[in-house]
Each structure stands twice: as structure tokens, then as C-alpha cells.
């Protein structure tokens, strides 16, 4: 990992993005993914194709505040200069917040110990237009206490198959650990904050969708325990919350802040 011209050097970057206009993180042939846009910017800087590896595969319309990625460059670009250089080539909806050199054994996805997602919901008669891309709208009143109670039942190690959509991939296991799940309210704004060791396809949006059913009085908080215990394939009973309210907030590479807590 010398850093001379032609020698590969590994970098780690933290990226924030507005996912509204994109088909998600992953490269797709018939749509524009954020990965493709970042790779194009780096290819211009490095003078050669660059493959970027992300910490997650966020869905279409999902946003990120602390997405992490790694890649190699052949040109010896100082890490301190990489933020400005990349942002000069990226659209306003995608910003590199931090850049650093990475050890060769670092992997943005495989080295992660956990992730925090936040889901934003606005409950009122009218959703202000400037909030529309980032807040899901709900006009019905919600029972905060019931949602908090239901959220606490997600905490722990469970089989979350009932809260996962059918992905086009085979998984070794659908068991995951949720370390904490908070529901906070500030005026009309509700924020759902969940930390876990990893999440299944659309799991976070499915859990939030079910909490909203609880908040509206359509489900009991204890139904979360029943669904987790049954560990049966997902049914129409579990709805998926819209993508626009979801943010990948932070990726953890140590166990600090990842102990199980119920609030």
C-alpha cells in the first residue's frame, strides 16, 4: 500500500445522499444508482475504472447521512484532498463528508458491526412541501405509547422473516439482532431510530409500517411478539412504509453503542 503512481491505495469515505431521484445504491443496467455516479466521479479522478463497495444496498428513494464505502485508486491522491475532488465531480444530491486511508483488510460491508437507520414521519393535516422528499405523511393521530411498547418487542435476537420482503437472493439465515428501537416525537414529527447488527430486505420499513398500524389502533403492541414467535413468511398484515422517510444514519465498526436496550 505504498501510494506511488500505479500502486493501489485503499480509501474509506463517508457519503450523504438524497436518494429521491436514484434507484438505490447498487448499480443497475436500466436505472441510475448512486454507486454508478460515485464510480464515474472516481474514474474521472483516477483516469481508470474504479469499483466502489458500499456498506449497504439501500432501496430506491432511500436516503443516507452516513453511508460508508471503500475503493482503490492508482493515483496518489491525498485523502485530505479527496473530499473536495469528489464533490466537484458529484451532483448536489450526493456529498462526500469524510475520506481517509483504509487498511487492506477493511471492508465497508463485512467489517461493519452494526447500522443505525432512522425513519421520519410527519403527522398533521398538511405536510409542508419542503419536507415532502424526506418525511412520510400521516394525517391520522398516532398512539405514541403503544408504538413505543411495540418497538421494544423488536429488541433482541429474533427470526425477522415475518418483517422482510422477498428479496431476489438466498439467505443463510433470517435471524438478526436489534440492539435498540426508539420512537421519538417532537410536535408533528415522529422519528423511529433502530440499531441492529444487520437488516433483511425492507425489514426496517416493514417494522415501521407495523408500528404505524399499532399507532393507528389497527394492531396491538403484543402482535409484534406473536409475529416474531411464529417466524412465518410475511403476509399482507405487515405493510411496508414508504421509502422516502428512511435514512441510513450511521454504520458502526466497533461494538460501542450496540448493546441491547429497551426504552
Per-region residue spans from a language model:
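Structured-RNA-binding interfaces characteristic of tRNA pseudouridine synthases
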Residues: 2-263
Amino acid at each position: 500500500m505504498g501510494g506511488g503512481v500505479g500502486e493501489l491505495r485503499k480509501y474509506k469515505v463517508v457519503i450523504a445522499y438524497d436518494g429521491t431521484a436514484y434507484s438505490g445504491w447498487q448499480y443497475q443496467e436500466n436505472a441510475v444508482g448512486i454507486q454508478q455516479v460515485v464510480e464515474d466521479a472516481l474514474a474521472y479522478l483516477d483516469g481508470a475504472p474504479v469499483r466502489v463497495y458500499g456498506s449497504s444496498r439501500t432501496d430506491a428513494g432511500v436516503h443516507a447521512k452516513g453511508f460508508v464505502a471503500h475503493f482503490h485508486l492508482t493515483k496518489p491522491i491525498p485523502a485530505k484532498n479527496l473530499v473536495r475532488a469528489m464533490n466537484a465531480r458529484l451532483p448536489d444530491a450526493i456529498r462526500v463528508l469524510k475520506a481517509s486511508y483504509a487498511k487492506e483488510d477493511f471492508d465497508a460491508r463485512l467489517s461493519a458491526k452494526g447500522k443505525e437507520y432512522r425513519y421520519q414521519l410527519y403527522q398533521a393535516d398538511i405536510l409542508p412541501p419542503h419536507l415532502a422528499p424526506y418525511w412520510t405523511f400521516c394525517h391520522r393521530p398516532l398512539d405514541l405509547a403503544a408504538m413505543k411498547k411495540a418497538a421494544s418487542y423488536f429488541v433482541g435476537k429474533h427470526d425477522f422473516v415475518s418483517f422482510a420482503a422477498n428479496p431476489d437472493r438466498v439467505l443463510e439465515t433470517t435471524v438478526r439482532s436489534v440492539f435498540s428501537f426508539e420512537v421519538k416525537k417532537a410536535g408533528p414529527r415522529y422519528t423511529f431510530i433502530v440499531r441492529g447488527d444487520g437488516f433483511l430486505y425492507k425489514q426496517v420499513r416493514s417494522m415501521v409500517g407495523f408500528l404505524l398500524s399499532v399507532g393507528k389502533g389497527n394492531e396491538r403492541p403484543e402482535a409484534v411478539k406473536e409475529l416474531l414467535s411464529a417466524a412465518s413468511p410475511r403476509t399482507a398484515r405487515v405493510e411496508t412504509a414508504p421509502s422516502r422517510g428512511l435514512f441510513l444514519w450511521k454504520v458502526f465498526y466497533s461494538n460501542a453503542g450496540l448493546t441491547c436496550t429497551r426504552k
